[in-house]
Swiss-Prot record:
Residues 351-361 have a biased composition (Polar residues). This is Rab GTPase-activating protein tbc-11. Residues 727-800, 861-895 form a coiled coil. The gene is tbc-11. Residues 422-612 form the Rab-GAP TBC domain. Residues 16-134 form the PID domain. Keywords: Coiled coil, GTPase activation. One of its GO terms (molecular function) is GTPase activator activity. It comes from Caenorhabditis elegans. InterPro entries: Kinesin-like, PH-like_dom_sf, PTB/PI_dom, Rab-GAP-TBC_dom, Rab-GAP_TBC_sf, Rab_GAP_TBC_domain. Rab GTPase activating protein for the small GTPases rab-6.1 and rab-6.2. Probably acts through rab-6.1 and rab-6.2 to play a role in microRNA-mediated gene silencing in different tissue types. Required for seam cell division and alae formation. Disruption phenotype: RNAi-mediated knockdown results in increased expression of the lin-41 protein, which is a target of the let-7 microRNA. Residues 337-383 are annotated as: Disordered. Gene3D superfamilies: Pleckstrin-homology domain (PH domain)/Phosphotyrosine-binding domain (PTB), putative rabgap domain of human tbc1 domain family member 14 like domains, Ypt/Rab-GAP domain of gyp1p, domain 1, Ypt/Rab-GAP domain of gyp1p, domain 3. SMART domains: PTB, TBC.
Amino acid sequence: MEDFKDFTEVTQFTNVQYLGCSQLVNNDNDNEMKALMKVLDEQKGAQTINVTLVVPHNISGTVKLIDAQGKVLSSFSLVNIRFCIRGESSTSQNNCFGISFTHKISVGEHNSSDILHQCHVFRTSKAETAAKALYSFSYAFSNKNVSSESNRLEFQFESILEVKENDGTVEKPSWKLCPQHNGVFKVRRDREKKIVVQLRQIDGFLLNIKKCFGMLLAAGRNLRHSDLQLLEMDRNATGTDSAVFVIEANWDPRVHMFEVLNTETPRDTRVFMTVAIDVIVSEISEPIRFSMEAMSRVFHEHERFYKTPQTVVSEEFTLVLEKSCDQSDPNDRKLTFISLESDSDRKRSKQNLGKSPSRMPTQLLHPTGDDESDCDEPLLSGSGKVSQECKEEHLEMWDQLIENWDQQSDRPQKISELVLDGIPDKLRGRVWQLLSNVRILAIDQPDLVEKYHIFLSQPCPSEQVIMRDIHRTFPAHDYFKESQGKGQQSLYKISKVYSLYDEEVSYCQGLSFLAASLLLHMPEEQAFCTLVKIMFNYGLRDLFKLGFDNLHLRFFQLTALLKDYIPDLSHHLEHIGIETHMYASQWFLTLFTAKFPLQMVFFILDLFLSQGMNTIFHISLALLDDAKTDLLQLDFEGTLKYFRVSLPRKYRTEASTKCLIHKAVKFRLNHSKLEVYENEYKRIKELERENEDPVLRMEKEIGRHQANTLRLERENDDLAHELVTSKIELRRKLDVAEDQIETSANAIERLTRQNMDILEENKNLMREYEQIKEMYRRDVLRLEENGSRAEKLLAEYKKLFSERSKRAENEREHFEVQKKAIIARISDCDKCWPAVCEWEKNRSPVHSASTPTGPDLLTKLEEREDHIKNLEIDLAQTKLSLVEAECRNQDLTHQLMAQSESDGKKWFKKTITQLKEVGSSLKHHERSNSSVTP
């Protein structure tokens, strides 16, 4: 068995068969080299020797062939190699490879007659070793800058990736490490996270990392730089060990750019994520980006994880730098960046060699294209858009056809031709029911819908399996995306009822995909009836019965058809170890509904319901014929990945799907051969049973039982895990409920005491209120009596002043009259008039002061009238104040009645104070009224 060893300067491949060397006419002619390889391989015999092939790591090296004793049989410079080739994968030369080189007979001569072209042919026991040998040649050709090898330096780095989650609150965060198993982080959605990267240098002289100016994150792998999103840096410093640099950044997964990493993933699904850090190294003239890939599984926000052993996600990097050749500036000690390669990239490059075609050019490695960034991820079931466009005349034709079909029991002859272009999506539900004869089922079993509702209320032993499957069914479709949403509820009901209705088959994994396709076009009851009709009348349930014997029969038939119609592909699949069940099991059990886009799923169901079970063979052969060119170039792992990932992606458009359907229908398949293959399969099985050793049969039976036991144990472990998780969740909810009950009881007790205190306080307030009310009533009565008395006094004063005013006016008028009469009489008397004038002039002031004259009396009377007017004004103001006091008292009374149960003593004291102020103001007015009383 050959082996290969990777040293510093060369790679050695031991135990390689050297088939020989022969001259070539044209060293670039691959057909000539293949023919020579075939001849040497067929002529190999006992003279074939095992050698050690030594391949250098740079273009200036020498290729050597060393025998078992260590003697160099042949050697030639790598630069003389002109071409590398590998044997056809479908032939026995699959493990062979050859190299052509040019040999000069005489040094210094350049004409073609002095140049000899030769080809060395080798054979290995494994095809992978041949691919790795050619990779070594390719790697050597890529290292063309030989002169700088002595100036190059290699440094080894190790990066450790950790993810922390906030297990506390926003105000009091509690950061805990996310558990991970086999490189898969277990994270919870909608929780703030921190990404921590520890970059450690493990080889080479210590480089000084100055800082990290950015950490980037994105979902997926093999991403472009523009796909990564910058995170907010939180920590950026050298650790306790000088060789370790720690970078920490905050990550909010609720941002729409990280929606993929914040969406709950089904149980068997993982999400790739890429973390990159850009660092600046003092000794290097440009920044360096370290990129890591990891996987994560997103759980519910309140998921609880078991304590698992703390492991780390790490990646090793090889950094190649080059010393500067310019010694003019001794202070310039900067190193030039050459390359940075991770161990994962190196291993992935070597593994991809096994998937190479037979002709292997020297440029074996190429970067991933922009359109291949998601090629490693399979399509989610239920993905793709379904065209809703349909011409009006085409739709009218379908409506007329359906109307005639409803009136007649026979299927229209035109339906088979129309189905080839697909049924209009708006009419698929009705047409599918007509194609499957659901109305006949309603006649044969009129109580089927009633049974559906009866089974809904009955317990189901497959409930746990169904619940797990519905989360994996069409997760890319909006109708089934929401957990416990309307779509998942309907899907759960149909799956549960069918498992109870068909006790022999019960529930089988994959049944939910077909049910989901029906639910997208019809209500629950109609979808269930259609599912029953498909399972029983189309023979689909037979595939699930009796240990899947009928399914193995279909595999045998498909294998035989593949040998008849596509023999080269059949031979290739058989050669690399691909069996039919590895890729066709889902095709038969789910009718292509699990992996392919919805547009293709509906087209296939249209054809299946119209043509029957043989449709699966037509579609399968059409798919394999379409993929023939690609499959012939792939190995075992590449083929399985192609069926899982690449094949469904080819039919994401309506045009490609229609092309496949037409190709499948036009595939000239002899259906009578299916019966022949069935009889042959039964005969083979009968011979196997007759010739089988009882011990082997028992061993197989034991193995089958052990497999079932392991499966049941895994299911039991899953159920136990779910049970423990449920118990923990219920315990948590119970603790929360008990805490809430205790808190509520304490609150009720506290409120009861407060209520009793408030009731007692209310009683006291009511008593005080009644007392205040009685005091107020007495004060109001007293004030009213004082007011009425003041009014009476005022009326008497008015009357008295009025009488005095009238009498004074009369006396004044009488005095004036008498005065005028006297003056008139004595005015002509010269003797009396001077005496009168003298008398008027010398009249005694005491007399005039003590004896008021008429004008004095009038003046006093006017003063009295003014005083009376002032008293009237004061009285009016007093009445106004009284009215205001009464209004205020009424307002206070209303407030006291409305708030007596909620307000405390402060408000009541304030009210009493206001009442006292009103009472004192009234008393003040009363005293002022009394002071003006004569």
